[in-house]
């Protein structure tokens, strides 16, 4: 499975997630080999997740995609009819959105890299993993753009680079260059390159432009190759920093890193930008995904005068 996952350009995280779901599927069916099972067993497992484990629709879809990968890509079963699965219910939850003042207050409570990353989440609409995976070459200071490479959906997109972040980002890249120079001096400095680019461009892995904008403090072993490399900062560090900032700022919302992205979209719509523009900046394939923010705009009767107020 590992070789096929790498050939299909699955991220390491997706590969591990699929492997865990396939393992659960096998154990659910008494440790029988998947090739000895069929669509009926897949239906039973997915229905079990919805009915007995009460998983969310997104979790059930994740399991479905893992099994689809197993049968179509690994076992080469093109015909796999799994109609009739009991689907988990989609909960219609509105996203948590910060006010502009709240977003600014939260960012002000954060320090160093975490503050800069939060600024990119809110100012550029990045997902947390898109932010921590940014490479030096993805930032275009001259054009005021950020290229989001192969984000969710395997499609590159362009979003804005906030003017207020240009100077702190330049300072961050100076730190990265110094760290990279030191790594090279010690015999390291090669970074993971996606899609077998390392085999195509032998020396690219050590080029500064491919380095992460937010590198980890310590070197670590790459689980793909066993080589010692410098990975990017952990997204969990940023998540914890956001939770701490929420508490210190006294903001009583169940916010997270993704709330900055929600706020980015909502505030653009409030400022009069059209939904298609926001869709492109967010990288949504379907405009219906972006439409959820119009519900946030209308929440609480916003824009409608209460009869109690005369």
Q: Where are the regions that the model predicts?
A:
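Conserved catalytic core of the tyrosine transesterase superfamily
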Residues: 1-310
């Amino acid at each position: 499975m590992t070789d096929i996952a790498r050939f299909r350009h699955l991220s390491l995280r997706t590969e591990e997630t699929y492997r865990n779901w396939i393992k659960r599927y096998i154990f659910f069916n008494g440790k029988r080999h998947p090739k000895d099972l069929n669509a009926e067993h897949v239906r039973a497992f997915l229905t079990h997740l919805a009915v007995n484990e009460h998983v969310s629709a997104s979790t059930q879809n994740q399991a479905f995609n893992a099994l689809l990968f197993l049968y179509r890509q690994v076992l080469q079963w093109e015909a796999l009819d799994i109609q009739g699965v009991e689907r988990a219910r989609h909960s219609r939850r509105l996203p948590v959105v910060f006010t502009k003042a709240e977003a600014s207050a939260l960012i002000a409570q954060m320090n160093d890299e975490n503050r800069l990353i939060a600024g990119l989440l809110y100012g550029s609409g990045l997902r947390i993993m898109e932010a921590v995976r940014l490479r030096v070459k993805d930032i275009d200071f001259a054009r005021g753009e950020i290229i989001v490479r192969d984000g969710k959906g395997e499609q590159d997109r362009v979003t804005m680079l906030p003017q207020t972040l240009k100077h702190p980002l330049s300072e961050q890249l100076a730190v990265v260059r110094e760290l990279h120079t030191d790594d090279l001096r010690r015999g390291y400095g090669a970074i993971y390159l996606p899609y077998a680019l390392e085999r195509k461009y032998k020396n690219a892995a050590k080029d500064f432009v491919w380095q992460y904008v937010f590198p980890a403090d310590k070197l670590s072993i790459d689980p793909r190759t066993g080589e010692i490399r410098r990975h990017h900062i952990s997204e969990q560090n940023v998540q914890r920093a956001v939770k701490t900032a929420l508490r210190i700022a006294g903001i009583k919302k169940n916010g997270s890193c993704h709330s900055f992205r929600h706020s980015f979209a909502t505030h653009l719509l409030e400022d009069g930008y059209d939904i298609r523009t926001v869709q492109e900046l967010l990288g949504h394939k379907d405009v219906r995904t972006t439409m959820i923010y119009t519900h946030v705009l209308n929440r609480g009767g916003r824009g409608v005068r209460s009869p109690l107020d005369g």
